[in-house]
Amino acid sequence: MLNFNDFLDNEDIVTEGIHDKYIFRAFYLAGGPGSGKSWVAAKTLEGSGLKVVNSDIGFENYAKKAGLDLNQMGDFTKDETKLKDELRRRAKRGTETMGQHAVNGRLGLIIDSTARDADKIESAASGLRYLGYQTYMIFVNTTVEVALQRNEERPRSVPAPIVMRSHAQIQNQKSRLIRMFGASNYIEVQNNKRQDDINSDVYKAIRKKLNTKLTSPIALKWIENEKAIIRARAGGKIDKGFFARIFR
């Protein structure tokens, strides 16, 4: 266990989160294959410093380094399939570790999901709210026809029946997602048209949520504690309530 002086000298105790503008915000992205979730996120949240939690990114990087062409998964040998599965597991572990570090610092998050597993989303979002996060859902919607067309155009496509089944499953979860996050924290983006930029109303709605003032007593208390640690480390006065605030 750290003694008090070690505690003040430990650089890991004060996380980077206190210096980030958009701490305690978590944006969930939901939508099926070909919906354009990544494009919507890039157009609305780029430059915000939010940490992207998406195991697909790591998986694709691992596969590329290993020389696996994910467009040819249907033709993989047994050994290639085994390697692909191991790389997927490694990417998920890495994403979980990165996500945990981000949450430890209460950093803002962009969490990529499909919405098929609503139970998992609800559990994770509830956990984040327990820590003081403000959680939002951005539902990126398309018709099934557009989803199928875009899937064919993607570098890594999936079989058409999977796209259709996924689209139907996600549509069936919409009402539950609205209840889960609350109508005021749910933004639906109709993304059927090809365009170079995001609809201005959508952009404004998402940025408004991003800049919403923190109100959670848990979040405000965490910020107060982190500032107290910084002051203590800098040699500032430690008042009588310091230990109670930090160690309660």
Functional labels for PLM-detected ranges:
Residues 2-17:
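Proteolytic processing junctions in secreted/extracellular precursors
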Residues 32-33:
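The conserved Walker
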Residues 36:
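Conserved glycine(s) of the Walker
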Residues 26-28:
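Short hydrophobic/aromatic beta-strand immediately N-terminal to the Walker A/P-loop
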Residues 39-105, 119:
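Conserved substrate/cofactor phosphate-moiety recognition/catalytic segment
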Residues 17-24, 101-103:
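Phosphate-binding P-loop
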Residues 112, 116, 129-150:
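Conserved phosphate-donor/acceptor-positioning beta-strand/loop module used by diverse small-molecule
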Residues 144-248:
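Conserved GTP-binding G-domain of TRAFAC-class P-loop NTPases and closely related GTPase folds
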